Amino acid sequence: MVTYKDAGVDISHEDKVIKALVSQITFKRSDIKPAELGLHYAGAVEFGDYYLVLSTDGVGSKMIVAEMANKFDTVGIDMIAMNVNDAICIGAEPIALVDYLAVGHITEEIAEQIGKGLNEGAKEANINIVGGETATLPDMIKGIDLAGTVLAIVKKDEIITGKDVKAGDVIVGLRSSGIHSNGLSLARKVFFDIAKLDINDKLSYGKTVAEELLTPTRIYVKPVLEMIRDKDIEVKGLAHITGGSFRKLKRLNDKVTYYIDNLPEPLPIFKEIQRLGNVPDEEMFRTFNMGIGFCVIVDEEDANKVIKIANKYNIPAQVIGRVVDSLEVNGNKIVGKAVVKYNDKHIILE
């Protein structure tokens, strides 16, 4: 049995580190006020009738897989996806991005491949890449790290924080394209350390390890913005399902409980990781998206409209759960958490 912590990633410790860092950042300009969003998906500052929204993220250890496969033409899509998918979670439209590339050494050919992916991601997200920084740091970095920061914009009266999420609302899940850009440390440990596979070896269902792990993260910008702008849909909450899985729903409203009891069958990649690594169900749902990359919370009567828009963009979607005031699990009252029903048991995501 292997866990994410065994692979070197301790989510609980990361939470503590983030809180420690944020606790020391107290300065605020008096003339340009930040939006009070707490630990949401993105940050924002007031700009007239608008909020300017900023979000930053990177590709993480997926870059190690790209180096193993010597294939870098899609990691730019991943970086942009991780940023823009976060920005839209407060209803903002991404408009521009700057990238940060840190390397020990890089060839022109690899740089071209990365640029190709960045361009494809920019096209899919409908944003401008307006600049960036390339840092050559041979004493610090052995490989390549790719990150970026996105700028987005939303009218003040149109920001979506999740405060209106209430019991009775439904959770519509939009399918992921695969592993996306989270949980790669655990996936690599399972495939390469435990199963002793090579990057080009085939998995039990025919795809190679490289094909599965380098499948680009799905970009949800266009369908989600269409949902937000549809006057017949009241979007109450939006969640990018990344590291930590459905526990991210708590960012929207931690006064209610999110009951996920109608998930589609997990994608083959997740079943393969679980089988080869003997990974417990609980650990799978704390680490991976398990086939759902984005959640939209709406009134029950709006669910089919959301699904129809997702399908228009060739994204499978379905109602995967609902919002409740509380839930009783094994005699305990659960409030302010996500609970997943899977294999006839309840998994509580703290």
Curated annotation (Swiss-Prot):
Pfam families: AIRS, AIRS_C. Gene3D superfamilies: PurM-like C-terminal domain (3.90.650.10), PurM-like, N-terminal domain (3.30.1330.10). Its main location: cytoplasm. GO terms for molecular function: ATP binding; phosphoribosylamine-glycine ligase activity; phosphoribosylformylglycinamidine cyclo-ligase activity. It catalyses: 2-formamido-N(1)-(5-O-phospho-beta-D-ribosyl)acetamidine + ATP = 5-amino-1-(5-phospho-beta-D-ribosyl)imidazole + ADP + phosphate + H(+). One of its GO terms (cellular component) is cytosol. Pathway: Purine metabolism; IMP biosynthesis via de novo pathway; 5-amino-1-(5-phospho-D-ribosyl)imidazole from N(2)-formyl-N(1)-(5-phospho-D-ribosyl)glycinamide: step 2/2. The keyword Transport does not apply. It is an enzyme of class 6 (ligase). One of its GO terms (biological process) is 'de novo' IMP biosynthetic process. It is found in: Cytoplasm. Keywords: ATP-binding, Cytoplasm, Ligase, Nucleotide-binding, Purine biosynthesis. InterPro entries: PurM-like_C_dom, PurM-like_C_sf, PurM-like_N, PurM-like_N_sf, PurM_cligase. PANTHER family: TRIFUNCTIONAL PURINE BIOSYNTHETIC PROTEIN ADENOSINE-3, TRIFUNCTIONAL PURINE BIOSYNTHETIC PROTEIN ADENOSINE-3-RELATED. HAMAP family: AIRS (MF_00741). Belongs to the AIR synthase family. This is Phosphoribosylformylglycinamidine cyclo-ligase. It comes from Methanocaldococcus jannaschii (strain ATCC 43067 / DSM 2661 / JAL-1 / JCM 10045 / NBRC 100440) (Methanococcus jannaschii).
